[in-house]
């Protein structure tokens, strides 16, 4: 969950409600099967899911506080075992989606053989951090440009066959080997080349340590495995709700205001209902 979300900072349920509603609206008329992993979640979250998805399209899976790594392993097991779709989607619960836009991501994934993974999120770090200063391939499709990138978060679309081939890399996910390190390995980001990695040792020690952990955890794939392509849309189809990491070129404040009402009114409502706590 976002550390400092744009809205509902102290109310995870309302944040989840807002994001889930936007996800459902972004799907539009797409027929989906949603496997909801509830890891030690209160029962009210089950009611939230059943309000937005009918019984035929929803399967609730209750877990007893197993944590993120085990939850990811369960997701992989479920999605590789299902036969409903050739495309599978990993969704974190703190993303806000634009309405009726998810279909474009699905169509893009099916339009090209070189589309292996697709994130809905055009991360602002792509434009500011040294780690992302590298050439990208850019294509047009639908109403957007799409570019290749080296890393993303753990919300992404892929083909079942691709997941089958790459799942061993995802299974290296632990509390220390987080998503960024897995993506560096899958896309074989140039920073994993020792020649490019050395400047990080001098100027960005934290990034250098991440690169080193990626090598330690996934060296076999880095050396001998396939390079996979990760694509993101420009402009974004969704944004992470961390208030300092909103996707660029979209009026997220205005869009969210249209969903929940003027933010000032929302702050007053939340403050009154929750004993003076901040809403944003």
Predicted regions and their residues:
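Short, flexible/disordered intra-domain loops and linkers
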Residues: 2-14, 169-175
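Short, acidic, metal-binding catalytic loop of nucleotide-sugar glycosyltransferases
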Residues: 13-31
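Short loop->beta transition adjacent to catalytic acidic/histidine clusters or analogous donor-positioning motifs
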Residues: 26-35, 58, 86
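Acidic ATP/Mg2+-coordinating residue in the GHKL
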Residues: 39
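Active-site-proximal specificity loops/subdomain of glycosyltransferases
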Residues: 42-86
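Short beta-strand-to-loop acidic/aromatic patch adjacent to the donor-nucleotide binding site
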Residues: 85-96
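Conserved catalytic core of nucleotide-sugar-dependent glycosyltransferases
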Residues: 96-171
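C-terminal catalytic/acceptor-binding lobe
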Residues: 167-280
